[in-house]
Amino acid sequence: MTYELKMPILGFDATKIELEKIDETFSKIRGLDGKQPFEITLINPFSLCDYAFTIPTADERLLDLDESRGDKVEVYCVVVLQKPIENSVVNLMAPFVFNPANACALQVTTLPVAEYPQFSKVLPLKEFLSKEILETLNR
């Protein structure tokens, strides 16, 4: 699905992105306009941990979220893929929020570290995976 970015992603000038779901855990976004083409791999943070945050009011307004309409957002975090995959790192502090109801999206960049200390550092994927899954990945 194509989304309009309500704020540019830091370092990029694209205003339109495509969200492509790979599976229940991984997705990617691709810049559709702008001078620099890009692709960013995303991960569903809810598949990793007990993930919750409050969308800042300014971001809610930009996304035109309306609970009375039943707007439901989709949330993804940036994952930087490494080999082996369990060494990939996840940034939980700057999630992407997508509003499918109006095809708008943005990256939240203003979560206060004091309120979300558990998200304040980039963590390797292996921190979230069970021993069984890690063994499967290493076969």
Swiss-Prot record:
One of its GO terms (biological process) is bacterial-type flagellum assembly. InterPro entries: Flagellar_assembly_factor_FliW, Flagellar_assmbl_FliW_dom_sf. It comes from the Bacteria. Keywords: Bacterial flagellum biogenesis, Chaperone, Cytoplasm, Translation regulation. Belongs to the FliW family. Interacts with translational regulator CsrA and flagellin(s). This is Flagellar assembly factor FliW 2. It comes from Helicobacter hepaticus (strain ATCC 51449 / 3B1). The lineage of its organism: Bacteria, Pseudomonadati, Campylobacterota, Epsilonproteobacteria, Campylobacterales. The gene is fliW2.
